[in-house]
Amino acid sequence: MSLALVSSMAVSAGNLEKAVDRSNLDTSVAPGENFYQYACGGWMKANPLDPQYARFGTFDQLAENSREQLKNLIMNLGDNHAKGSIEQKVNDLFKMGLDSVRLNREGNAPLKADIAKIQQLGRNGASAAIAWLHNGIANPFFESAVMADLKNSSVNLFYLCQGGLGLGDRDYYLENDANTVKVRNAYAKYVEQVLKLAGYKGGDAKKASASVMKIETELARVAMSREEQRDYSKQYNIYTVAQLKSDYPNIDWDAYFGGLGLNNVDKVCVMQPKSIAKVNELMKSLNDKELRDYLVFNYVSSAANYLSDDFVQADFDMFSKTLSGKKTMQPRWKRSLSVPNNLLGEAVGQLYVAKYFPPESKKKMQELVNNLRVALGEHIANLSWMSPKTKVNALVKLNSFTVKIGYPDKWRDYSAVSIDAANSYWDNVKGAKQFEAQFQYSQLGKPVDKDRWQMTPQTVNAYYDPSTNEICFPAAILQPPYFDPKADDASNYGAIGVVIGHEMTHGFDDQGRNFDQNGNMVDWWTADDAAKFQKLADRLGAQYSAVVVADTVHANGQFTMGENIADHGGLRVSYSAFKKTEQGKGNTPIDGFTPDQRFYLSYANVWAANITKEEILRRTKIDPHSLGVNRVNVAIRNLDSFFNAFGIKAGDKMYREPADRVIIW
């Protein structure tokens, strides 16, 4: 690659927005003492945690901005739209969520017909009932999906995966520390409470709760850990339908596939065979009442947020208050807005982009992406630990990346979704969920559509998809503090530049490195290079695992490995790209800070946040991303340029000896 390919976003200093917001800083702390506190402490003090949040940071501020934009958009749609139009569907779904009087009047009535159907089930109907719930409503016992074949990314494959855990992670059922026991006990009470609200009598609800806990604990005992799930090679287990029926005969697979509307399943990837074997065992050992109660609970719990206030409160108390430490519920308009935003996502996105996404942002992002791609290519070419053979393969993959910016070129068709205000809120939500699930299942037998997006344009996030070898940056993240055409290069490269580098590096993290340029799970590494990579990754993981996040709980560097590698690579690559800009080549201070200092301050400010202790513990269990403080303080201590920028030396708390610094990408 030629350096001539690099284009600059440099802007003359006289035309820049403020490069560093000094109010974000806590100058009572030295950068070498605690850089995160120095860079973000002022922001944290000025933005105490609102009780409706378990975590709130600059990332969430941008999400709030996007939410306000969507609110204004939908509120201004008006009521006079042709029935069946996108505007009618979005508007009606939003307004149904606002109608608390109607929701409270209806109570549990929207559930009764479906519960009655489940309660009438005999054992022979259980597999069809599971399929009905898997059609977008709930995931009892296990989960299923249609996605690209891990080893043939151009075709779709049917997958069976572990599931059925209402608490979302096996550790909540198996560990016995004080916080986990508290959560588990609260969950058992929640199961009992929502079943009572759904119409169960007190004693029956208590017995049903015990059955649910028994079933979910059994499923948890055989579930793969989150660390184990990072290794896709151990989860690619292909079965013919005949083998599926032979190995797991207590599940009526014909009824299950038929319930999903599929008659063309010829092979299945069973990602966690032990979990499906346990379901097969439970389908025989459970009595009819236990089976029905578990299915009813899954149905009711999934519906709770779309019903009367007592259901919504029960859900909040369990999953937001107990699990995350939130003190108060979000206002109704925010909760109502999230429903069309999630269920009619691209329809809302089409309206959002037309109003809020300036075309020039796409051009600037394309320049940045190109600069980052060049920088990562140079890093790969210059790696001392990687052989020429593997480097060639890595560069082929890098140069094959598909880049998606802003919004899709073609939009989803929601004409088959019916939103009718004459029906209950839950019935409308259920119908939209079923539509989405049917769309996903209907992809079986079709080529993978590589033009599809996995996120909506109004989502404040970005992603890398190994099956398509693509990086995607939705419109909503292309706003300050991540991206601002008026900001100086240091600010943009420290924020959105690192995000771009982060997503690119995911193609070469502990999971992404196992996929080739076409998105197929192929080993393109020499054995020696793979061993060297693993040694470096383990050293990086150990840095994070050494950190105590709360009480005596440590971060899990193995579980967060991919995100940590991506943060580390994103920082290094974006810094290199920044140093090729005119501003990066110079040393002109703005607001009293050098370009390198502004780069690192910009990066840290992206992760400024306040967070509850409960949310720290929850995220440590279930989130593959490190906490914001560690995404800053651990990651940057591997970069020589950080120490040089702030004059950090031996004896400072932030200092890390050169021999202990890790360079992967």
Task: Give, region by region, the residue ranges found by the protein language model.
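Hydrophobic/aromatic-rich, well-ordered segments within soluble, folded domains that form packed cores
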Residues: 24-45, 173, 177-196, 561, ...
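Short secondary-structure subsegments characteristic of cysteine-rich extracellular domains
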Residues: 52-74, 205-222, 492-498, 591, ...
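Noncatalytic, helix-rich "gating/capping" subdomain that lines the substrate-entry/channel surface
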Residues: 77-367, 371
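Gram-negative bacterial Sec-dependent N-terminal signal peptides
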Residues: 1-13
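Short, Gly/Pro- and small/polar-rich lid/capping loops
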Residues: 14-23
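Short, solvent-exposed loop/turn elements at domain surfaces
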Residues: 43-47, 167-168, 481
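Active-site-surrounding "flap" and adjacent substrate/cofactor-binding loops of secreted or lumenal enzymes
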Residues: 30-33, 38-102
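Intrinsically disordered, low-complexity linker/terminal regions across diverse proteins
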Residues: 63, 212, 247-250, 269-273, ...
